[in-house]
Design a protein with these regions (language model features):
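Helix-loop-helix
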Residues: 48-54, 58, 148-162, 232-305, ...
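ABC-type nucleotide-binding domain
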Residues: 326-582
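An intracellular "coupling" helix at the cytosolic face of ABC transporter transmembrane type-1 domains
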Residues: 10-13, 99-103, 119-132, 136, ...
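Short intracellular "coupling" helices and adjacent cytoplasmic loop segments at the cytosolic face
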Residues: 47-48, 83, 91-115, 119-121, ...
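Alpha-helical transmembrane segments of multi-pass membrane proteins
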Residues: 14-16, 22, 63-82, 129, ...
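Hydrophobic alpha-helical transmembrane segments of ABC transporter permease domains
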Residues: 21, 29-33, 58, 70, ...
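Transmembrane helix-loop-helix hairpins at lipid-water interfaces of multipass membrane proteins
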Residues: 16-73, 77, 150-155, 266-270
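A short amphipathic helical element positioned immediately N-terminal to and/or at the very start
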Residues: 1-11, 113
């Protein structure tokens, strides 16, 4: 895990090394000052020698300036290194997520990924900054202070050493318990983020069903849960300060008592006693800082593990060696295909799918909920890989193609239509970033989207809000179809992508496809038989298996499931979503 994270320090190695070096120099300068003060008191002030007092005073000023300068540089470089490290982690996670296959994405919740790229990275950033600066400064201060205490007076230093051991042991047990609590706290952040994301993305539904109070209570409960867990963890950590202060004051009292006796006995000077007070205070403060560092590290350990999971996740689907860079045509063949979302689980979504589709054919796909319609389409563009058998496009196994080439030539309009914030043209050019405005207009004409776009005041420069919230469902579907058409694909898959348009527009879109892209293989997944009855062939899926694969007329004669759907839709003049397999 640590190796994975440190690999993203990259160009920030230099400030990451300079920061602890400056921190070490800062400790040297700061810890030299009490020793100089002791000499100033003993050899200058008490001896009445102003020349010596001036000399040590100037030396103390020089050391203070050097300590201030190196401390400033340590802070500057630590901030630069940690901020750059965090930026690289976010970029690394984002880049790796872009390579994920659908099967990889299925392992994580959206809220979980958002938490990793925000809260978790911030935790690691803060911990890294503490480690390369404070985690160097604090232990060096303890070591240097203890060394100087032994130089000044070994007898009193034994007392300090015992105090340090007692304090360190106490802090160890406190931090050990606190770490467990903090680790659990940050796992709960996913639930909070999921609640926020779900509520904001579905705010219109929340308001439509007047569920504001329910959602507020749900969020309050999640926030209160995290608050209580934090309080529980902090109740453990708060013992830090009283234990720390007790030991410091105990050391001060003992130092004052024994120091006074040693001064009277002539074995210790006033200046040396003053320096011992400074060193013991610096030592104890550094130990307290170390305890805070341990808290920060414990809080960030869980975050680091979660970040590492995303960074080390390998894409299940990658390009083959020497991939094919051209799809010859739109012919498709499923050769006894078996598929499940969890390989080896035995829960097959598709079972023994065996069929051939000629280039340029129009294929309808119909079936009940969970019958495998979308899974069937996803295999063609290799969004998932088959468990057994093979899927070929253009006469070649889809696993032999370059992924970008294959997905450019097999355009899919997914069941969930997503538009991004930007103009209509910006959204259309997701299909082809080099498309001219004329090509975009032509694609919209083919998708019957031009008729409503022309009614907008800004036409193709109309701004689309995030998620397409300012256009209707049918308008969104037609824009997504136009976006796919700009790819000029060999295969076009519409996954229930005209469900929100009226039947007349649906018919116009199908007619436009026949006239403008006759050579493109078109696979239309639908619930309405009217959307696919004119297809060359219709695939009927039931429980992940082929129930029928023929023309509309033939299926009416030979397939009971298809005939039942048709009869119900003819009778009710509506859609019928029969219950299918898992």
């Amino acid at each position: 895990m640590i190796k994975t994270l440190l690999a993203h320090v990259k160009e920030y190695k230099r400030p990451s090394l300079i920061a602890p070096l400056c921190a070490a120099l800062e400790v040297f300068f700061d810890m030299s000052i009490p020793f100089v003060i002791a000499q100033l008191i003993d050899q200058g002030i008490q001896a009445g020698n102003m020349a010596v007092a001036m000399k040590f005073g100037l030396l103390m000023l020089f050391l203070a300036i050097c300590g201030l300068t190196t401390g400033f540089l340590a802070g500057k470089f630590a901030a630069e290194a940690s901020a750059g490290f965090a930026a690289n982690l976010r970029e690394g996670m984002y880049d790796n997520i872009q390579t994920f296959a659908f099967s990889n994405i299925d392992k994580y919740s959206t809220a979980g990924l958002v938490t990793r790229m925000t809260t978790d990275v911030t935790n690691v950033q803060n911990a890294y900054q503490m480690i390369i600066r404070v985690a160097v400064r604090a232990p060096l201060t303890v070591i240097f202070s203890m060394f100087m205490c032994f130089v000044v007076d070994r007898r009193l230093s034994i007392m300090f050493l015992i105090a340090v051991v007692i304090l360190a042991t106490s802090l160890y047990f406190i931090m050990r318990r606190a770490m467990t609590s903090f680790n659990y706290v940050f796992r709960k952040y996913d639930e909070l983020n999921a609640s926020v994301q779900e509520n904001i993305s579905g705010i219109r539904v929340v308001k439509a069903f007047v569920r504001e109070d329910y959602e507020n209570k749900k969020f309050t409960k999640a926030a209160e849960n995290i608050y209580q867990l934090f309080v529980k963890a902090e109740k453990i950590v708060i013992f830090n300060n009283p234990i720390m202060m007790f030991i410091i004051f105990a050391c001060m009292i003992c130092l004052s008592w024994f120091g006074a006796h040693f001064i009277v006995a002539g074995s210790l000077t006033t200046g040396e006693l003053t320096s011992l007070f400074s060193y013991i205070f610096a030592m104890m403060m550094s130990l307290m800082m170390l305890s805070m560092i341990m808290v920060m590290i414990s809080m960030s350990t869980a975050s680091a593990e979660r970040i590492s999971e995303v960074l080390t996740e390998k894409a299940d689907i990658v390009n083959p060696e020497n991939p094919l860079m051209e799809v010859p045509d739109g012919s498709i063949c499923f050769d006894h295909v078996h598929f499940s979302y969890k390989h080896g689980s035995g829960e097959e979504v598709l079972s023994d799918i065996d069929l051939s589709i000629a280039s340029g054919e129009i294929i309808g796909v119909i079936g009940g909920t969970g019958s495998g319609k979308t899974s069937f389409a996803n295999l063609i563009s290799r969004l998932y890989d088959v468990d057994a058998g093979s899927v070929t496009v253009g006469g070649h196994d889809v696993r032999q193609y370059d992924l970008e080439v294959l997905r450019d030539q097999v355009a899919v309009v997914l069941q969930k239509n997503i538009l991004f914030s930007g103009t209509i043209l910006d959204n259309l050019r997701w299909g082809n970033e080099d498309a001219t405005e004329e090509e975009c207009i032509e694609a919209c004409r083919q998708a019957c989207a031009d008729e409503f776009i022309e009614r907008f005041p800004d036409k193709y420069n109309t701004w689309i809000e995030q998620g397409g919230s300012n256009v209707s469902g049918g308008q969104k579907q037609r824009l997504c179809i136009a976006r796919a058409l700009l790819k000029k694909p060999k295969v076009l898959i519409l996954d229930d992508s005209t469900s929100a348009v009226d039947t007349a527009t649906d018919a116009n879109i199908r007619r436009s496809f026949v006239e403008t892209i006759p050579g493109t293989t078109k696979i239309i997944i639908a619930q309405r038989i009217s959307s696919i009855q004119h297809a060359d062939k219709i695939l009927v899926l039931d429980g992940g298996k082929i129930s029928g694969f023929a023309s509309h007329d033939e299926l009416l004669k030979t397939n009971a499931i298809y005939r039942e759907i048709n009869d119900v839709q003819q009778q009710d003049d509506g859609d019928f979503d029969m219950e299918g397999g898992a």
